């Protein structure tokens, strides 16, 4: 159901408001580049800083622009189950193809609490649900045993795994049904995750280099590992440098360097710090662009 590259798309801002002109151009580039789908209102999209109205509008406009050409997996997670349900119902009504639901953050629920949270969301969703496990941001880890229980729900179809723990991911794959999809939540682990049975990646770097990310994953899935590895190692410095500061600070800076949007973020996120690390990142991405990587 979920396979390939899904771009965790940034949310451009201009003078404090969502810059839809830039956003639509980014979406069109994603469509042209052949990604499987886009994921608006996720971590990379600065969803915690969006108002409820902005969140709903951004998803609506994404569906309208994409118009069935690629999938839209809408981020509707919250640390309030009630709010997550409301956002999920709204996104489903707008015609998304799937839901991305993150671990409840700050509350620190137990495994049973997360099981009940995600079950409640899945019960109201008319679209497939992709769980999102990112303990580095949420301070709770959705364990393989809990994922296995959740995978029995007919609407829970996949997980975006961002623990960075291949052993844990292997347990998830081995304990869940074969039609339950695991996607990497870390660009730099894309090929390792594919090698243990993952189906793709929810990517940050594909905002900037969508075609290269698509080619890397497509070649691997077609069995051309060597060609896939060549692209992977070309992109690896970008995968690493895209996290020299908290995501999405570096990737939004890089998108502004390439002219896609302004480098405006919403507090408490701030622009990429000037210095050696940012200059190195800038040099890397422009060198790849000069080499024809897109």
UniProtKB/Swiss-Prot annotation:
Pathway: Amino-acid biosynthesis; L-lysine biosynthesis via DAP pathway; (S)-tetrahydrodipicolinate from L-aspartate: step 3/4
Annotated positions binding pyruvate: 44, 202
GO terms classed as biological process: diaminopimelate biosynthetic process; lysine biosynthetic process via diaminopimelate
Xref: PROSITE patterns: DHDPS_1, DHDPS_2
Chief localization: cytoplasm
Site residues (Part of a proton relay during catalysis), renumbered to this chain: 43, 106
HAMAP family: DapA
Protein purpose: Catalyzes the condensation of (S)-aspartate-beta-semialdehyde [(S)-ASA] and pyruvate to 4-hydroxy-tetrahydrodipicolinate (HTPA).
Entry protein name: 4-hydroxy-tetrahydrodipicolinate synthase
């Amino acid at each position: 159901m979920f396979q390939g590259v899904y771009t965790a798309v940034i949310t451009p801002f201009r003078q404090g408001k969502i810059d839809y002109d830039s956003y639509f151009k980014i979406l069109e580039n994603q469509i042209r580049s052949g990604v499987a789908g886009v994921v608006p209102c996720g971590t990379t999209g600065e969803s915690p800083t969006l108002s409820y109205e902005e969140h709903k509008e951004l998803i609506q406009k994404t569906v309208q622009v994409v118009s069935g050409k690629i999938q839209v997996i809408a981020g509707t997670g919250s640390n309030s189950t009630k709010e997550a349900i409301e956002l999920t119902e709204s996104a489903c009504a707008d015609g998304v193809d799937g839901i991305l639901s993150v671990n409840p953050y700050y509350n620190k629920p137990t495994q049973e609490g997360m099981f009940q949270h995600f079950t409640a969301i899945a019960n109201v969703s008319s679209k497939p649900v992709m769980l999102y496990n990112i303990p580095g941001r949420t301070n709770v880890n959705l364990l393989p045993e809990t994922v296995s229980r959740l995978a029995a729900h007919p609407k829970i179809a996949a997980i975006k795994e961002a623990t960075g723990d291949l052993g844990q991911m292997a347990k998830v794959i081995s304990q869940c049904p074969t039609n339950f999809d695991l996607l990497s939540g870390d660009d730099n682990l894309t090929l390792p995750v594919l090698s243990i049975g993952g189906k793709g990646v929810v990517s940050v770097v594909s905002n900037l280099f969508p075609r290269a990310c698509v080619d890397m994953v497509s070649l691997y899935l077609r069995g051309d590992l060597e060609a896939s590895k060549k692209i992977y190692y070309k992109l690896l410095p970008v995968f690493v440098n895209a996290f020299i500061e908290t995501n999405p600070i570096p990737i939004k800076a890089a998108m502004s360097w390439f002219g896609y949007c302004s480098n405006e973020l919403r507090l408490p996120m701030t622009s990429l710090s000037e210095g050696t690390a940012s200059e190195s990142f800038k040099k890397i991405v422009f060198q790849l662009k000069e080499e024809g990587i897109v």
